[in-house]
């Protein structure tokens, strides 16, 4: 049901049902700039039709019956079995069913809105798993991330396996997306496979086109705007200011980045590494871990170098291996760092 609340009556006045509106619907929204209240997955007067879109007459939420003198109407979508989500976008409203994506655009009399299917097999995973950011809409699907900026395509991701191989889709309705506009980021919170509550996040940076992952319990989020900092709430209702300090409520915020494995001569030769040249802008200190292995299926050997700071010019090492990766990690309070180019002094060490 759809309700209205008149603020002029004060906070003690209860919201009242709009009895002329569909008696059941999946969700509703107001379109702009044409100002129509729209019900998605609406009751048609006889039954609840989860693929039906209905709208009232312009600026009159009590008038839902189409006539020659109003702009009320309806449209039954095809492609799917139920409407999952809807969102205002640039000059249109995007509608996701459980399989497809549709565009709803205001075209004026006599039809009021025009509808077009813009994609198939691109469903959104939940009703809150999308965001609109600078004219672009991105969302989490069932096996991919998607982007729509006038054309629909898969958003390339380096963390697809990490996310979608360990996700609890039974609790998909709890998945939600938010923005961190200050850093050009969109973040999704979701349940890992072993959890029934939100316990992980995945973040995408639009400018740097970089993905990050982590663990955090946030069931709701609002970006900075009226509030000075982004605010998130956990499952217990505790609110947190985010992006305020480099710590996690006074405790060190553990962070790391790890490279893929590198080799030389297409893996035919061993490497002998003699020096790491750090390239950091930072405060605090961090650790470098060099992981090597002699054969692709062999166990990695880790060599740790601690206490790296912005004044560390080089780290002398003597490490051999056929494949190598480097991990950079911080676990101290007030630590803030950015990493530049990876520089290793490497020379071939034979074909063993």
Predicted regions span which residues?
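Elongated alpha-helical scaffolds
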Residues: 1-2
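Surface-exposed flexible segments
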Residues: 5-10, 46-63, 107-109, 192-210, ...
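Beta-propeller and closely related beta-pinwheel folds
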Residues: 9-175
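Beta-sheet repeat architectures centered on beta-propellers
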Residues: 121-136, 142-352
């Amino acid at each position: 049901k759809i309700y209205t609340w008149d603020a002029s009556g004060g906070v003690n006045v209860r919201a009242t049902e709009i009895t002329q509106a569909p008696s059941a619907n999946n969700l509703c929204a107001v379109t702009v700039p044409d100002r129509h209240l729209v019900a998605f997955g609406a009751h048609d007067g006889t039954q609840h039709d989860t693929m039906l879109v209905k709208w009232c007459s312009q600026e009159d939420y009590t008038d839902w019956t189409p006539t020659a003198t109003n702009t009320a109407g309806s449209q039954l979508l095809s492609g799917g079995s139920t409407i999952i989500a809807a969102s205002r976008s640039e000059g249109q409203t995007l509608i996701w069913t459980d399989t497809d994506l549709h565009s709803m655009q205001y075209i004026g009399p006599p039809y009021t809105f025009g509808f077009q299917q813009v994609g198939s097999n691109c469903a959104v995973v939940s009703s809150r798993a999308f965001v609109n950011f600078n004219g672009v809409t991105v969302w989490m699907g069932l096996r991919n991330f998607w982007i729509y900026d006038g054309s629909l395509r898969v958003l390339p991701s380096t963390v697809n396996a990490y996310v979608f191989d360990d996700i609890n889709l039974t609790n998909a309705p709890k998945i939600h997306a938010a923005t961190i506009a200050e850093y050009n980021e969109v973040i999704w919170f979701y349940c890992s496979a072993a959890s029934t509550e939100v316990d992980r996040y995945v973040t995408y940076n639009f400018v740097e086109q970089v993905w990050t992952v982590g663990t955090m319990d946030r069931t709701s989020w609002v970006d900075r705007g009226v509030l000075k900092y982004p605010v998130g709430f956990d499952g217990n209702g505790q609110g947190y200011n985010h992006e305020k300090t480099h710590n996690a409520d006074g405790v060190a915020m553990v962070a790391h980045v790890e490279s893929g494995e590198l080799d030389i001569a297409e893996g035919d030769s061993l490497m002998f590494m003699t020096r790491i040249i750090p390239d950091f802008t930072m405060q605090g200190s961090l650790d470098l871990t060099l992981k090597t292995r002699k054969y692709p299926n062999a166990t990695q050997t880790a060599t740790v170098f601690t206490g790296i700071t912005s004044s560390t010019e080089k780290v002398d090492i003597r490490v051999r291996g056929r494949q190598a990766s480097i991990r950079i990690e911080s676990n101290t309070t007030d630590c803030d760092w950015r990493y530049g180019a990876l520089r290793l002094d490497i020379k071939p060490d034979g074909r063993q």
